């Protein structure tokens, strides 16, 4: 018998990312991370002169962080216990844009904190991977959780019946990120988020359509 499915991002939903990343690039690369709007790349500037990094300089830093520094990441408050409780009522898959190369490290990272769920290391928009998971698993309903608005738009296009929760669990940047118009709710606290998800699982209805234009 199929169950509901929760598809969750990891960074800034389950694990802190930008704060430990900022500490590392400061210490190891002389780069300051100061987020003034929703742009991640524009937040990275050289300490020596204040000029922003080019886009091609950002990806190697992210790759280096996920290769060597994931131990710096700690869970978002309440995330682990909430996911474990929700797993009694739904299947859970972690869909994280670290790419396939870092997928094994993400599996180990989450397992070290007690989360033993399937992990998919994707790249790009999450709509197609979400649609593929739904086709494979045929869940009774699906809830998608992510901190990035573009992924909610992608999922809304590819799988419109999915409930979409916009969550930015890092307090240092939450107020810099506008609520996604493609999400059914914006909740940055796991206590309230767990209650919202649990209500949806109990109701068992597909998500209503949203106007995202």
Regions found by a protein language model. Name each.
Residues 7-9, 95, 145, 167:
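Short hydrophobic segments within beta-strands
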Residues 128-131, 173-182, 196-198:
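Short, charged, surface-exposed secondary-structure boundary motifs
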Residues 118-124, 184-192:
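Short acidic-hydrophobic, aromatic-tinged amphipathic segments that line or gate anion-handling sites
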Residues 99-143, 150-157:
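Substrate-recognition "cap/lid" segment bordering the active-site pocket of phosphatases
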Residues 144-188:
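Acidic, Mg2+-coordinating phosphoryl-transfer loop and its flanking beta/alpha structural elements
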Residues 1-58:
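Active-site neighborhood of HAD-like aspartate-dependent phosphohydrolases
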């Amino acid at each position: 018998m199929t169950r509901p499915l929760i598809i969750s991002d990891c960074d800034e939903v389950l694990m802190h990312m930008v704060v430990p990343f900022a500490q590392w690039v400061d210490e190891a690369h002389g780069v300051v991370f100061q987020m003034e709007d929703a742009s991640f790349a524009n937040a990275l500037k050289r300490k020596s002169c204040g000029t922003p990094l080019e886009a091609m300089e950002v990806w190697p830093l992210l790759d280096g962080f996920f290769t060597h520094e994931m131990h710096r990441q700690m869970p978002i408050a309440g995330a682990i216990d909430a996911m474990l409780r929700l797993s009694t009522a739904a299947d859970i898959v972690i869909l994280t844009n670290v790419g396939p190369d870092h997928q094994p490290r993400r599996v180990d990272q989450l397992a070290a904190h007690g989360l033993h769920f399937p992990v998919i290391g994707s790249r790009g928009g999450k709509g197609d991977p979400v649609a593929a998971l739904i086709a494979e698993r045929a869940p009774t309903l699906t809830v998608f959780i992510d901190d990035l608005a573009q992924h909610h738009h992608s999922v809304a296009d590819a799988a419109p019946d999915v409930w979409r929760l916009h969550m930015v669990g890092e307090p240092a940047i939450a107020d810099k990120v506008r609520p996604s118009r493609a999400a059914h709710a914006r909740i940055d606290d796991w206590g309230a988020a767990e209650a919202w998800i649990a209500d949806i699982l109990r109701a068992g209805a597909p998500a209503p359509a949203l106007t995202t234009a």
